[in-house]
């Protein structure tokens, strides 16, 4: 069976190893495995789940959802202050990125991304047959606007930027994003998966600039990674273009209900975000006191740190043996010998600090 020639050199996406497999490997009960590698919330969306339990008998799961997702767009309008015609509802933010590449990219076109950053920009663009041009970030992980603009050619159709950036946690000033959009004159997709943790957003740029598309999710701050709800924000004329390729029923009625329930209780989300930010700052200080690592500033719900003495992969393995699963980035360009950890509850963060201190002490003894 022959597949598209384009895919002949592709490798399967590196999905996270299931917790059951990790537990079997390290000899621990699966209940003791703590995922600090996915940047998901340690909090359950309690009030949304309570609303769902009360309404289960009334949800028409035997019917297709309203394909315009009008009710959810109304709630997002209230949350963002933007008009109903400004939204594209998606099955998670990744579907939003996929829609953008389908609308703007032809085979042979070019896309500009920075490095290091979220890998799906490269993957989604490559699937469309585009050539991905990578502009390295500076040593402090800030973007180089001049180099990005210099990389734009007549073949360039899109620029993808994550803000705050994954996996580095830094924030790009809105003025830099505005300049990129105005001077590049190509589609500028700004991924704001983590914006609630910093309180700063480029969404207002999409009020005036037709080429700005903001991509968001309810996975992180709203504690709904498993629900798979994302949305794009753009000018109405851009939304019309994006809706041309949007699947009509990719979001389930259960997911739609939970999304609306979460948006109906924003105080719960904001409280969880405040707790996470407080824990993040505590964790930055505590990790910064550990010899042998350097911790980078973050405006997200995760931290990136570099192992100075020893091998980050060995530290990663030792932590996994204690049931703490971090993201190993040690072989990723720009973040060599680095690990990334999700900010969790005080109890889990205490456990992480203690385990990391032991792992680094063992490393210095080798």
PLM region spans:
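N-terminal small-domain helix-loop-helix segment of the aminotransferase-like
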Residues: 1-92, 99
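Short beta-strand
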Residues: 35, 294-298, 330-331
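Conserved PLP-binding catalytic core of the aspartate aminotransferase-like
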Residues: 277, 290-322
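Short, conserved charged micro-motifs
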Residues: 47-48, 310-317, 348-351
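PLP-dependent enzyme catalytic core of the Aspartate aminotransferase-like
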Residues: 321-322, 331-366
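Conserved core of the PLP fold type I
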Residues: 60-183, 194-209, 213
């Amino acid at each position: 069976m022959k597949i598209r020639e384009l895919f002949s050199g592709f490798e399967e996406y590196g999905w996270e190893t299931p917790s059951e497999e990790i537990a079997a490997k390290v000899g621990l009960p699966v209940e003791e495995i703590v995922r600090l590698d996915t940047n998901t919330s340690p909090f359950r969306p309690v009030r949304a789940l309570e609303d769902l339990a009360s309404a289960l008998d009334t949800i028409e799961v035997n019917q297709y959802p309203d394909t315009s997702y009008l009710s959810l767009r109304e709630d997002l309008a209230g949350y963002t202050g933007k008009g109903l015609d400004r939204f594209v509802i998606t099955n998670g933010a990744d579907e939003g990125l996929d829609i953008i590449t389908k609308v703007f990219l032809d085979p042979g076109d070019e896309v500009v991304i920075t490095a290091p950053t979220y890998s799906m920009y490269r993957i989604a663009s490559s699937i469309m047959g585009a050539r991905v041009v990578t502009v390295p970030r500076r040593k402090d992980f800030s973007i180089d606007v001049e180099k990005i603009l210099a990389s734009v050619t007549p073949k360039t159709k899109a620029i993808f930027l994550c803000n705050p950036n994954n996996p580095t946690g830094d924030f790009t000033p809105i003025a830099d994003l505005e300049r990129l959009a105005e001077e590049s004159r190509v589609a500028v997709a700004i991924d704001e998966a983590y914006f609630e943790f910093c309180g700063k957003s480029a969404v207002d740029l999409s009020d005036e600039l037709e080429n700005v598309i903001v991509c968001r999710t309810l996975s992180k701050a709203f504690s709904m990674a498993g629900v798979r709800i994302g949305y794009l924000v753009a000018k109405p004329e851009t939304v019309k273009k994006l809706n041309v390729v949007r699947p009509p029923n990719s979001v389930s009625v259960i997911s739609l209900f939970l999304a609306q329930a979460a948006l109906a209780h924003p105080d719960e989300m904001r409280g969880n975000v405040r707790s996470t930010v407080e824990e993040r700052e505590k964790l930055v200080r505590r990790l910064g006191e550990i010899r042998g690592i350097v911790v980078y500033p973050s405006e997200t719900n995760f931290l990136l740190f570099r192992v100075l003495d020893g091998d980050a992969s060995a530290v990663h393995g030792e932590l996994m043996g204690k049931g703490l699963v971090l993201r190993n980035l040690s072989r990723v360009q720009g973040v060599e010998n680095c690990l990334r950890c999700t900010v969790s509850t005080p109890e889990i963060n205490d456990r992480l600090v203690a385990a990391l201190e032991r792992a680094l002490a063992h490393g210095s003894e080798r």
